UniProtKB/Swiss-Prot annotation:
Seeds of most monocots are enriched in tocotrienols and contain only small amounts of tocopherols. This is Homogentisate geranylgeranyltransferase. Pathway: Cofactor biosynthesis; tocopherol biosynthesis. Involved in the synthesis of tocotrienol (vitamin E). Catalyzes the condensation of homogentisate and geranylgeranyl diphosphate to form 2-methyl-6-geranylgeranylbenzoquinol. Possesses low activity with phytyl diphosphate as substrate. GO terms for biological process: vitamin E biosynthetic process. It comes from the Eukaryota. Keywords: Chloroplast, Membrane, Plastid, Transferase, Transit peptide, Transmembrane, Transmembrane helix. The keyword Metal-binding does not apply. Its EC number is 2.5.1.116.
Length: 408
């Protein structure tokens, strides 16, 4: 113990010799050992107090700014509601536009279908194919197919189509009550077109037809248009000495003259004389087309009345089907067509060109065989089948015009 005391005294003496600064540092460290804990606690207390103050102030600020936030939130909600409302309005408007467009499209489509039926499309196709075939007959070589020829052909075709629509439209105007029985699907009989609309269409296409004919300057074309107008009007108009469709012979004569004679001769002359500037000269194909189409047009004129017997009888139309009965008229029509095909086969066999001979003989033979096969199974009492067979005869009519240019 004495040794320990002596060592401590020696250490104190050494520190004293080193200087008072070291002694004060050691003594200061000894003094701060207890007071440091109190300082930390005091500092922690001050921090807690400051935090509490900040919390109170933040709470006060939050309370002060809460109305603004509520207002801002309310504004945001109102804006969202407004956007939703605008979106709904836009959707409704878009839906209205779509519905309006669909309604307009449906209405336009309905009117176009009605106009298509008003034009009697099977007659339109017959006019197009017939005039096209006849217009090819004067052509001698590929050099004849020029822009001038195309222009002359289109003028004749457009004028003839407009006159065709006038004739069939006029017939519908005077046959509304009859068509309600015989052809209830036609637009005037079905009420899809008003009488005023029918009159407007008929007059418009008549004016267009004559305008095109006058502009072309073709005498044969104008002759064809004038005769078609006169015969078509006499066939349908209810007036003294008119309404020729009441009489079987006059009705058949109108159709035969226009379809068989006028179309072949007038449009052939238009292309050869007016367009090609050549002297008018008949050809073998032209003579054959005229004679064959006389038979075919007579069949069309007679057969078209077979499904219309009921309405024609009720309104006093004395067609051959009303007088003789549908069965007899049907047998007569089939006999005429088969005889015409037989004659066409003989004419084709007399051709000096092998290719033309093969086409005309085989073509007419095939058409005759098809006709005979279908005619065997037809029930005349079935109006729907008779109407379908009538459309089949028109298809044979179209096919014949494809064979006529090969008859040479």
């Amino acid at each position: 113990m004495q040794a320990t005391t002596a060592a401590a005294a020696a250490q104190l003496l050494t520190d004293t010799r080193r200087g008072p600064r070291c002694s004060r540092a050691r003594l200061g460290a000894t003094r701060l050992s207890w007071p440091g804990r109190f300082a930390v606690e005091a500092f922690a207390g001050r921090c807690q107090s400051s935090a509490t103050t900040v919390t109170h102030r933040f709470s006060a600020i939050s309370q002060a700014t809460s109305p603004r936030r509520k207002a801002r939130r309310q504004c945001s909600d109102d804006q969202s509601a407004l956007q939703a409302g605008c979106s709904k309005v836009n959707r409704d408007q878009h839906g209205y536009d779509v519905n309006w467009f669909e309604e307009i499209s449906q209405e336009v489509s309905k009117k176009l279908r009605a106009f298509y039926q008003f034009c009697r499309p099977h007659t339109i196709f017959g006019t197009i194919i017939g005039i096209t075939s006849v217009s090819l007959l004067p052509m001698k070589s590929i050099d004849d197919f020029t822009a001038t020829v195309l222009k002359g052909y289109l003028e004749a075709l457009a004028a003839a189509l407009c006159m065709n629509i006038y004739v069939v439209g006029l017939n519908q105007l005077y046959d509304i009550q009859i068509d309600k029985i015989n052809k209830p699907g036609l637009p005037l009989a079905a009420g899809e077109f008003s009488v005023a609309t029918g009159v407007f269409l008929v007059v418009t296409f008549l004016i267009m037809s004559f305008s095109i004919g006058i502009h072309s300057g073709s005498v044969p074309l104008m002759y064809a248009l004038v005769v078609s107008f006169l015969l078509g009007s006499a066939y349908s108009i209810e007036a003294p000495l008119l309404r020729w469709k009441r009489h079987a012979l006059l009705a058949a004569s109108c159709i035969l003259f226009v379809r068989a004679i006028l179309v072949q001769l007038a449009f052939f002359a238009h292309m050869q004389q007016h367009v090609l500037k050549r002297p008018l000269a008949a050809t073998k194909s032209l003579v054959f087309a005229t004679l064959f189409m006389c038979c075919f047009s007579a069949v069309i004129a007679l057969f078209k009345d077979i499904p219309d017997v009921d309405g024609d009888r009720d309104f006093g139309i004395q067609s051959l089907s009303v007088r003789l009965g549908p069965q007899r008229v049907y047998q007569l029509c089939i006999s005429i067509l088969l005889t015409a095909y037989l004659a066409a086969t003989v004419v084709g066999a007399s051709s000096t060109h092998l290719l033309q001979k093969i086409i005309t003989v085989s073509g007419h033979g095939l058409l005759a065989l098809t006709l005979w096969q279908r005619a065997r199974h037809l029930e005349v009492e079935n109006q729907a089948r008779v109407t379908s067979f009538y459309m089949f005869i028109w298809k044979l009519f179209y096919a014949e015009y494809f064979l006529i240019p090969f008859v040479q």
